[in-house]
């Protein structure tokens, strides 16, 4: 896939600093270090658009990336095992909840799971919240390239036990990029 015109717009720690141009938004949600930023980079064809790190918790604000002047890909802070003070973690939680509940321009979310780890309680809480609020989402299973075929199948089967069909993704091979774009495009066309 060729690179899209994608640009970093703002890193927001407060709702009043979110973009105000009313473009539709696609949110990327998941635990710390699950591959949200890598997925955004793969989707846009820009290896360094979203900052990636092996250290959990590097994304500490909501980052907005405008794509082709038509919509935003939104990288949210991860939840889970990031080594940050409790106060920061609570601020992230409040910020994320506010964004998910009140952001009118949020049209679709990618709930990202590490195929090796599957569902954890906070992932299930988020899934239940999205279901309860009628927020459309796609479950993306990342890091498939770190598993052999039988391990991948076992991980995907475990994710399916929650009644969803995960879309496998690999940042290394690009597996799943086309299918994720199809889901995003379908959502944006329906708006």
From Swiss-Prot:
Protein name: Probable GTP-binding protein EngB
Residue ranges of every copy of the EngB-type G domain listed in the record: 22-190
Cofactor names: Mg(2+)
Record bears the keyword Kinase: no
Purpose of the protein: Necessary for normal cell division and for the maintenance of normal septation.
Residues that coordinate or bind GTP: 30-37, 57-61, 75-78, 142-145, 169-171
NCBIfam families (UniProt xref): GTPase_YsxC, small_GTP
Source lineage: Bacteria, Pseudomonadati, Acidobacteriota, Terriglobia, Bryobacterales
The keyword GTP-binding appears for this protein: yes
InterPro entries the record matches: G_ENGB_dom, GTP-bd, GTP-bd_ribosome_bio_YsxC, P-loop_NTPase, Small_GTP-bd
Record family assignment: Belongs to the TRAFAC class TrmE-Era-EngA-EngB-Septin-like GTPase superfamily. EngB GTPase family.
Keywords: Cell cycle, Cell division, GTP-binding, Magnesium, Metal-binding, Nucleotide-binding, Septation
Single biological process term from Gene Ontology: division septum assembly
Molecular function, one GO term: GTP binding
Positions annotated to bind Mg(2+): 37, 59
SUPFAM superfamilies attached to this UniProt entry: P-loop containing nucleoside triphosphate hydrolases
Pfam families in the record: MMR_HSR1
